[in-house]
From Swiss-Prot:
Keywords, in A-Z order: Golgi apparatus, Membrane, Metal-binding, Signal, Transferase, Transmembrane, Transmembrane helix, Ubl conjugation pathway, Zinc, Zinc-finger
Role description: E3 ubiquitin-protein ligase that may mediate ubiquitination of MHC-I and CD4, and promote their subsequent endocytosis and sorting to lysosomes via multivesicular bodies. E3 ubiquitin ligases accept ubiquitin from an E2 ubiquitin-conjugating enzyme in the form of a thioester and then directly transfer the ubiquitin to targeted substrates.
Compartments where located: Golgi apparatus membrane
Composition skew (Polar residues), residue ranges: 328-343
Enzyme class: transferase
CDD domains noted in UniProt: RING_CH-C4HC3_MARCH4
Pathway(s): Protein modification; protein ubiquitination
Protein name (Swiss-Prot/TrEMBL): E3 ubiquitin-protein ligase MARCHF4
GO cellular component: Golgi membrane; Golgi stack; trans-Golgi network
Membrane topology: Multi-pass membrane protein
Domain of life per record: Eukaryota
Binding residue positions for Zn(2+) 1: 162, 165, 188, 191
Organism classification: Eukaryota, Metazoa, Chordata, Craniata, Vertebrata
């Protein structure tokens, strides 16, 4: 290795000496070539430093089962391996794959140089090491974030939270007022009352279970609170109130003018009779307006009542709910069974041929028999079938039967 280096140095000195002697250059350019010689010498020393102090090439990776050499990393792409293999000669002994590496000799001292801005490879870690270290740190941070997210989710599943304010039991007692389960099972009583006051509905919007709430007492009138109303709700309240007042006033005046002896002349006047008709029409309009806006006003009143009254919300009782469902199912089953029991009897009577010897007079003289217990339309059709002539029925065919299905509405 030293022979090519010596030859290179000899060739460089010869070239520089040839030009420095002035054999090929004129005298005025001597100073300039001296400066070039200094620069070239400096570049030569820098190349020598790079050549002598460069990092040794990495050793080949050992196969499975082969003993690993000290100071050689198992994987050059990871931070611990690089620290053990690549940086062992620069930072002293470190652990590599569970073994202690023997101490290596320190690097040779750098030769003096006038170039203060030169940065050799020993002044800092290589770019591959920095990139691998940053990638390892990024993977570690992502792993920690995933672990913290998973632990927070696990803790959230274990700790019950209010489905309205998302707070735990430290904000108050948690109740389960409906059939909902899981993360939407629990809620605080104040949160639920406030939600009811905003919606105006006393049933769950998910499972449609009506909350079991007990009214304790009404607040002091001085403590009553107003609820937020939209423009449409204000118009609905005003329409319902004005319609009710007009309906009360007009009905009162019509009753007085109809039955009062002093208003006898009004009842005979044509103008007042026209007014009676107009007031009657307006009363019908007011009744329709009240019926249309009544549910909205009632919902607003329930919202106001939820805010200005003290309540106690009861927990969901599964056994009681099952009993209520069973009782309701039995009632519906009895109703449907009674309807189905009446249906075959009606079909049998409709399908049975009438007695020919009794004639139409006997059928018409007993309308209060079992036929009258069914629907009115069936009774009329049954009577009409008896009133038809016998020969007309025989010509239409004796194999046809009249079958009717009667359902209750």
């Amino acid at each position: 290795m030293l022979m090519p280096l010596g030859g290179l140095l000899w060739w460089w000195c010869c070239c520089c000496g040839w030009y420095s002697c002035g054999l090929c250059t004129p005298a005025p350019q001597m100073l300039r070539h001296q400066g070039l010689l200094k620069c070239r010498c400096r570049m030569l020393f820098n190349d020598l430093k790079v050549f002598l102090l460069r990092r040794p090439p990495p050793a080949p990776l050992p196969m499975h089962g082969d003993p690993q050499l000290p100071g050689v990393a198992a994987n050059n792409n990871t931070l611990p391996a690089l620290g053990a293999g690549g940086w062992a000669g620069w930072r002293g002994p470190r652990e590599a794959v569970g073994r202690e590496t023997p101490p290596l000799p320190p690097p040779p001292p750098l030769p003096p140089s006038g170039d203060d801005d030169w940065d050799g490879p020993a002044t800092g870690p290589p770019a591959s090491l920095l990139s691998s270290a940053s990638s390892d740190e990024f993977c570690k941070e992502k792993t920690e974030d995933c672990y913290s997210l998973g632990s927070s989710l696990d803790s959230g599943m274990r700790t019950p939270l209010c489905r309205i304010c998302f707070q735990g039991p430290e904000q108050g007692e948690l109740l389960s007022p409906c059939r909902c389960d899981g993360s939407v099972k629990c809620t605080h009583q104040p949160c639920l009352i406030k939600w009811i006051s905003e919606r105006g509905c006393w049933s769950c919007e998910l499972c449609y279970y009506k909350y079991h709430v007990i009214a304790i007492s009404t607040k002091n009138p001085l403590q009553w609170q107003a609820i937020s109303l939209t423009v449409i709700e204000k118009v609905q309240i005003a329409a319902a109130i004005l319609g009710s007042l007009f309906l009360i006033a007009s009905i009162s005046w019509l009753i007085w003018s109809t039955f009062s002896p002093s208003a006898k002349w009004q009842r005979q006047d044509l103008l007042f009779q026209i007014c009676y008709g107009m007031y009657g029409f307006m009363d019908v309009v007011c009744i329709g307006l009240i019926i249309h806006e009544g549910p909205s006003v009632y919902r607003i009143f329930k919202r106001w009542q939820a805010v200005n009254q003290q309540w106690k919300v009861l927990n969901y009782d599964k056994t009681k709910d099952l009993e209520d469902q069973k009782s309701g199912g039995r009632t519906n089953l009895q109703t449907s069974s009674s309807a189905q029991a009446n249906l075959p009897s009606a079909e049998e009577e409709a399908a049975s041929p009438p007695a020919r010897e009794e004639g139409p007079t006997r059928a018409a003289s007993h309308p209060s028999g079992p036929v009258s217990q069914h629907h009115c339309a069936y009774t009329i059709l049954h009577i009409l079938s008896h009133l038809r002539p016998h020969d007309q029925r025989s010509t239409q065919g004796s194999g046809r039967e009249l079958v009717m299905r009667v359902t209750t509405v």
